A protein has these predicted regions:
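Extended amphipathic alpha-helical segments with heptad-repeat/coiled-coil character used for oligomerization
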Residues: 7-10, 14
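Conserved beta-sheet core of the metallophosphoesterase superfamily
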Residues: 18-37, 42-43, 47-147
Length: 148
């Protein structure tokens, strides 16, 4: 899924377009390049909403619950999650039964983050495993080793 970020307005679109072109014959790989501030998917009994995260996170469950595009599947799902990024550090909480997970950043510290004192966050990637009936059943983290 493609999301425009506040740091990158065009590069991610071109990367997604290039990857979609490269994998065009692979039916198991899909690319969502639609311009939207929110996106969602359903995996079994779990609704997963996606948002950049540059907002008040506690408002996100209501945003998805009232969205014309996602309110139906949001309401029918047994489990509900919203995944965000933006803040470049990991955080997870539950708001009104919806798990909100802010993903860690893969990127290092650039000048803007350093000047703003947004430093020392653990760089990592998460792999989340879902079961059709039981929702999220596992989470794996791979930390990025820093070169000094």
């Amino acid at each position: 899924m493609l999301f425009r970020s506040n740091h990158d307005r065009t590069k991610s679109y071109y990367l997604a377009h290039a990857l979609a072109t490269y994998f065009r014959d692979e039916k198991r790989i899909l690319f969502d390049r639609e311009h939207s501030t929110i996106k969602g998917t359903v995996l079994g009994n779990t609704f997963i909403g996606y948002h950049h995260g540059n907002c008040k996170l506690d408002d996100l469950p209501l945003l998805f619950a009232t969205s014309p595009k996602y309110s139906g599947v949001f309401g029918l799902s047994k489990y509900r999650e919203v995944h965000t990024g933006d803040k470049h550090h990991y955080m997870a909480k539950e708001v009104k039964g919806v798990r909100i997970q802010q993903m860690p950043s893969l990127s290092g510290t650039d000048r803007w983050h350093s000047d703003s004192n947004y430093v020392h966050s653990l760089r990592a990637a998460l792999a989340l495993v879902y079961h059709d009936e039981d929702g999220k059943v596992a989470e794996f983290e791979e930390r990025i080793k820093c070169q000094h």
